């Protein structure tokens, strides 16, 4: 086996025909400026080729489902192993996915609870024991004389297949009827079941009417049913077709409640045998929220206080107005009064209806006048009914804007049915155990006391649970609970969970490619992560990590610096070798920062702010412990703390959502707090995150920044365009008229290949230019609209230098370090850091009011130290204009440049949620109790 991976002639995206050697069974870090080509090399070339070769070895039928990747633009790659990509874009959005299910810990927990769990009665809580035939007979006879009963044997419960043999065996044994999936069949007829669906099948043993003289016959029938089904007896009570399940295995002596033998599927919320029947295992239900139906209580009904689909036209003369006129007349209130001044009884009637009491509705229409007598359904029941009845995704989406998730009333958010929640191990249900953090869950397992028999059964299961929980702790995720929804995890957390899962799999000879695993991780936990990466390497694997973190780069066996610039100015190997060799290379920008020759300077002064504060009182969201904090306005404030300390809960859930609801009229549910003071000093809140600036290839930097509108206006003002009667719309590739209709303005056509990846080919008509011939004939300074879209920001800045409006927007894009991107570059090809800087440039180009608060969550994700320097310059400019910048960050270069710090902690999860210290970076560095301060002290020397 070769000792290196050889990449020859890589040309994917902006890579300039580069050759790279990567040592096998080593930790290699690829670094460079944002947009320099790191991901193009690691993911789009090496991973894509490794994955493609693996998928190519499968059958054509399997390839159709796996979505084969096309061959990357590279001459050849030697020494490749099967590749596993662990990036930040694969966080599951499935509401059924949790930390426990993703790490497979929950699979072992289900097995543990099924094998050594103690069942209890869900009604009285008493421990359940096996039920004898005599007890079953007594319960059936208690139904009363004359009751008609069918005794059935449940032979198949929730299993796929046609089950032909089951029917044949029942027929040979002399049985006449079976019930399959709730339908009764005669065994003399042909019974056909779908092979790929789960089925329930019961054999009818006997049909009888309960009387004292049938006890012996009933006993025989029950014994036969139990023997046939393995201890289960199903009594079908006629004529109301009600089923009662009895088990020889477990039943409550007092309540008579039976449960089947404990199996792992009983504890799965993704299986109908374990999931709560009300919420089907989601743990939550969407309910219409009165606060979202009427978000602004200071507005009157007549002025549109009700912001719900179908209820916006109270001012008109439709059916809504008729109802509200009748309500105001009957309950004596004015439609012009603000909602907050209406009595509670009136609001209850408006929201929940008249409960069947009829109103006098007067109508006056062209067809005549009259009176109708109808009950008022109520706004909330009306919205809930329409949500259940609609078949339209659009209508459902509209209605969901007025709904919020709340815990399921049946299971209380625990996802499982009552019988499953009544099974305990060490006095805890499986749901209660999953509410514990990883570190508490480990302590519980270590202290668990079992009988000798239970220990023999559960020993191996407990070992697997401990191992997986230990791996989660080793990657700095000890604060997460096993019940935490995967969709709520940050990109860094999700990536480290997948990393922990891979360690648990103990694979050897694999190529792992990771994308910034240190994101969201406090400096304190970085050593744990590095130890984990080295452990994965020492198992006999090759690791390629795209990373900007200095500690990770220093710990690497091999370092590759891609650059020298970004975009068209990048795509070359600037330096490669050990970290020491890269530091000694004068051409490497990364090496200069690593060696200390270049660094981000600490500001000479700190702003004190404008004298006003935004104060949060009694913050209690998630793990926040009745927290009071103040953000000085007119400053660059950074919220710090170890992972899981409550930073996102404070900033994103409380501050952003509360200000968004009050200042921006957003329909959101702010996190729990007693009050927020100081909103009157702000006029809007803007969250600048790393989400894409558009979801389709049609979106690009020019359209997002509104630069394209100005460019289209410019082309429409040319003499040629005026002579032809072309307006700005002619130069849009999104509407008919000027665009190429052969490709609908996409510039390319998608060819479906079925067993191969889809191919995108340039449109033969417009040659990829998006516009028709007539539109392209209109030119400004000799360039067509398509030529302008192909320009980089730098080229466009020179081209439009005599047009102040265009020049100003282009200059801000250049100042945030995006001079290399093309104006028409598809937004889907931009990295998270690039998308964030496009948003920042858009904000910078707007006229500042000086009363805006900008919120950023880890803005340094994907940014090189040199990019961080540019980002800080932009953020400082926003603050210099009188605005407030509030940032969640772990990057010490950003933290040391802030005016004010709020350090949360001291630990993550239940050990966090308090304010450790606050003040200038120097004040925080002087606090011995602050983990952030300990690392910050070294940076301020």
Where are these regions (language model features)?
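Conserved phosphate-binding elements of NTP-dependent enzyme cores
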Residues: 1-941
């Amino acid at each position: 086996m070769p000792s290196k991976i050889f990449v020859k002639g890589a040309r994917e995206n902006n890579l300039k025909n580069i050759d790279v050697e990567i040592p096998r069974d080593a930790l290699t870090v690829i670094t460079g400026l944002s947009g320099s080509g790191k991901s193009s090399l690691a993911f789009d070339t090496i991973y894509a080729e490794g994955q493609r070769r693996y998928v190519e070895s499968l059958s054509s039928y399997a390839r159709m489902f796996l979505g084969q990747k096309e061959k990357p633009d590279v001459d050849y790659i030697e020494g490749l192993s099967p590749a596993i990509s662990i990036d930040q874009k694969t966080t599951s959005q499935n509401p059924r996915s949790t930390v426990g299910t993703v790490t497979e810990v929950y699979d072992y927990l289900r097995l543990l609870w099924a094998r050594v769990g103690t069942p209890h009665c869900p009604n009285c809580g008493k421990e359940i024991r096996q039920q004898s035939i005599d007890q079953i007979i007594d319960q059936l006879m208690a139904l009363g004389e004359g009751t008609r009963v069918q005794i059935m044997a449940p032979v198949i419960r929730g299993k796929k297949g046609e089950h032909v043999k089951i029917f044949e065996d029942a027929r040979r044994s002399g049985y006449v009827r079976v019930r399959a999936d709730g339908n009764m069949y005669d065994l003399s007829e042909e019974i056909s079941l779908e092979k790929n669906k789960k089925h329930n099948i019961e054999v009818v043993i006997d049909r009888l009417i309960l009387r004292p003289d049938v006890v012996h016959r009933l006993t025989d029938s029950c014994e036969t049913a139990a023997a046939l089904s393995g201890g289960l007896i199903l009594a079908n009570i006629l004529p109301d077709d009600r089923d009662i399940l009895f088990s020889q295995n477990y039943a409550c002596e007092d309540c008579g409640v039976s449960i089947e033998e404990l199996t792992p599927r009983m504890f799965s919320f993704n299986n109908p045998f374990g999931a709560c029947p009300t919420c089907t295992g989601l743990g939550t239900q969407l309910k219409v929220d009165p606060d979202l139906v009427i978000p602004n209580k200071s507005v009157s009904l007549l002025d549109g206080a009700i912001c719900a689909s179908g209820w916006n036209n109270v001012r008109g003369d439709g059916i809504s107005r008729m109802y509200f006129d009748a309500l105001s007349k009957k309950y004596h209130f004015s439609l012009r009064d603000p909602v907050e001044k209406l009595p509670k009884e009136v609001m209850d009637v408006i929201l929940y209806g008249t409960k069947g009491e009829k109103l006098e509705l007067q109508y006056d229409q062209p067809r005549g006048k009259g009176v109708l007598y109808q009950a008022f359904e109520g706004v909330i029941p009306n919205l809930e009914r329409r949500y259940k009845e609609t078949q339209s995704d659009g209508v459902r989406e509209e209605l969901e804007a007025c709904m919020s998730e709340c815990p399921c009333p049946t299971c209380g958010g625990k996802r499982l049915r009552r019988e499953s929640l009544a099974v305990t191990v060490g006095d805890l249900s499986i749901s209660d155990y999953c509410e514990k953090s990883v570190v508490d869950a480990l302590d519980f397992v270590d202290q668990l006391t079992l009988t000798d028999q239970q220990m023999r059964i559960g020993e191996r299961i407990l070992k697997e649970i401990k191992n997986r929980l230990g791996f989660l702790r080793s990657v700095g995720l000890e604060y997460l609970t096993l019940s935490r929804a995967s969709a709520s995890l940050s990109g860094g957390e999700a990536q480290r969970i997948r990393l922990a899962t891979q360690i648990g799999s103990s694979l050897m000879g694999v190529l792992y490619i990771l994308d910034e695993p240190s994101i969201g991780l406090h400096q304190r936990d970085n050593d744990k992560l590095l130890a984990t990466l080295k452990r994965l390497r020492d198992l006999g694997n090759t690791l390629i990590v795209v990373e900007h973190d200095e500690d990770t780069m220093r710990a690497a066996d091999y370092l590759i610096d891609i650059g020298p610039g970004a975009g068209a100015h990048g795509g070359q190997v600037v330096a490669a070798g050990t970290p020491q060799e890269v530091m000694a290379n004068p051409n490497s920008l990364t090496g200069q920062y690593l060696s200390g020759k270049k660094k981000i300077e600490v500001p000479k002064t700190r702003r004190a702010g404008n004298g006003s504060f935004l104060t949060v009182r009694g913050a209690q969201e998630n793990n926040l412990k009745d927290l009071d904090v103040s953000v000085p306005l007119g400053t660059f404030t950074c919220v710090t703390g170890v992972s899981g300390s409550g930073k996102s809960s404070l900033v994103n859930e409380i501050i952003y959502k509360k200000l968004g609801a009050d200042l921006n009229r957003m329909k959101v549910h702010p996190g729990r707090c007693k009050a927020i003071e100081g909103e009157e000093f702000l006029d809007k809140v803007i969250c600048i995150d790393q989400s894409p600036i558009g979801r389709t290839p049609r979106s690009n930097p020019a359209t997002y920044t509104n630069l394209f509108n100005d460019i289209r206006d410019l082309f429409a003002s040319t003499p040629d365009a005026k002579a032809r009667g072309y307006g700005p719309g002619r130069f849009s590739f999104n509407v008919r008229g000027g665009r190429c209709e052969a490709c609908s303005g996409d510039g390319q056509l998608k060819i479906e290949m079925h067993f191969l990846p889809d191919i995108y080919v340039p449109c033969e008509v417009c040659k990829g230019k998006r516009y028709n011939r007539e539109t392209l004939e209109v030119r400004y300074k000799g360039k067509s609209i398509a030529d302008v879209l192909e320009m980089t920001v730098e080229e466009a800045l020179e081209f439009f230098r005599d047009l102040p409006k265009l020049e100003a927007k282009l200059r801000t894009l250049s100042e945030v370090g995006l001079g290399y991107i093309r104006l028409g570059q598809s937004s889907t090809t931009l990295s998270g850091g690039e998308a964030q800087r496009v948003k920042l440039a858009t904000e910078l180009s707007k006229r500042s009011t000086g009363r805006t608060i900008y919120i950023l969550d880890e803005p340094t994700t994907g940014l090189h130290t040199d990019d961080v320097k540019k980002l800080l310059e932009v953020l400082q400019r926003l603050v210099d204009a009188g605005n407030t910048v509030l940032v969640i960050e772990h990057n010490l270069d950003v933290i040391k440049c802030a005016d004010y710090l709020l350090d949360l902690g001291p630990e993550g999860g239940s050990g966090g949620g308090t304010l450790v210290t606050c003040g200038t970076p120097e004040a925080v560095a002087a606090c011995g109790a602050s983990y952030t301060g300990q690392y910050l002290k070294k940076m301020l020397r």
